[in-house]
Amino acid sequence: NQIAFVKSNPTVCKSLVIDTIDWAERLCIEHICASHNKKGIEDFGYGNGYTYVSEEFGRLLNRLQELVDIGVNVVLTAHAQIKKFEQPDEMGAYDRWELKLGKKTTSQTAPLVKEWCDLLLFCNYKTHVVATDDKGKKHKAQGGTRVMYTEHHPAWDAKNRHGLPFEVPLAYGSIAHIFERQEQSPQSNPTPVQ
């Protein structure tokens, strides 16, 4: 309902923030179960419930894209979780940060979100490691700064379609120029070919 309201009244806000997309996924699952009179998503049998989630989540992203198309910025926040990642051609596994979506739905909904967005930023606390002894054999982490990573890394997913540097300070000023550029560019509505 909120998306439809903003679409009908695009001057009501410049940005719509969904905090968080993992909770939106839970609401999506509850909506699907209530619509089909099911107690849980697995009650559909043969994985059909997860297909419904993927389809409904795709419809949500389509509705959000309609807002983007009329000049409203859409921001999706998400929690992250560490998962063990193992590549067949590598020796051993390593930890990797991923979107925290449902255990059985993440393989379908996470790619939809990642493909849809223009910016996928990974926020982290960058610590500084210093030697604590004269020989430089003992180290400790101290201080640090909050940063946003804008490009893919083995330890996290990130992307940007705006040419941002690999790492930027966790501050609106780091990405403000993207939104200012979008506000200045006129919205063009191409004439359909007859």
Annotate the PLM regions:
Residues 1-14:
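Nucleotide-state-sensitive switch-loop elements of NTP-binding domains
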Residues 8-11, 29, 69, 122, ...:
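Generic surface-pattern signal
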Residues 14, 72-73, 117-118:
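Conserved acidic residues
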Residues 17, 75-79, 121-123:
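Short, conserved beta-strand edge motifs with alternating hydrophobic and charged residues
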Residues 20:
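Walker B catalytic acidic pair
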Residues 23-111:
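P-loop NTPase motor core
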Residues 83-194:
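Conserved GTP-binding G-domain of TRAFAC-class P-loop NTPases and closely related GTPase folds
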